[in-house]
Amino acid sequence: KDILGGKGANLAEMTSLGLNVPPGFTISTTACRKYLEDNVLWLELKETVLSNLRLLELKTEKSFLGNRNLQPLLLSVRSGAPNSMPGMMDTILNLGLNDTSVKLMADFTSNERFAYDSYRRFIEMFSNVVAEIPRIEFEKQLESVKIEKNYNSDSDLTISDLKLLIEKYKKIYFDFEKTEFPEDPTRQLFLAVEAVFRSWNNPRAITYRNLHKISHDIGTAVNIQSMVFGNMGKTSGTGVLFSRNPINGNDELFGEYLMNAQGEDVVAGIR
């Protein structure tokens, strides 16, 4: 756990047991500590990440690097500290989407709404985690559309609504960053990895470690996995499950779930 982080170590153990774990790889806490010292991703690490990406493409039979004959490979990028720090650090989902791959994803899945909903979510998460643009900027645009159309839920958004929001979200990114939203998936990934490394030292993470007497010197791992989608329709969903009841400690399964949603919706209580 000190090297792979709690999440990475557990994913590796589950894989070794033959459980159905989405394929991926983990960047170690050692790499995080070096990044925090140097403040730059070094060439050897980038080459190792790209090498593992190519293996992931072969494993999933999808393409991250732009082969239009294959379904796009989208990634989740998650922090994974050795000690559990729930909600303290950052996650990015649907990484790899751009103006080209979103159309390919719509074609390969025959689900245009899903593709554009995933793109909308990705732009918001990336902008918040990497560029540190406040989520409220995106939420205001989302709520404006929902109020105008008299929608009760994000899942009521139409394809046209989603395309409009994507353009609005990109404009927010440009207004804050004075540059266009990055289209290159590889650049997206390296920026995301850096952001997760930096999240080890964000104020809420530091406060949490102080309160729980966790060392500030360990760093976080980064878990990169092939996406599994909970927002593909009414037969898809996402949830959180505990092997014990966290309220009273009873030895019973406990959890909650949402249909046609992604993990952040459950954690954030959006619906």
For each predicted feature, which ranges?
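Nucleotide/phosphate-binding sheet-loop regions of phosphoryl- and nucleotidyl-transfer enzymes
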Residues: 1-271
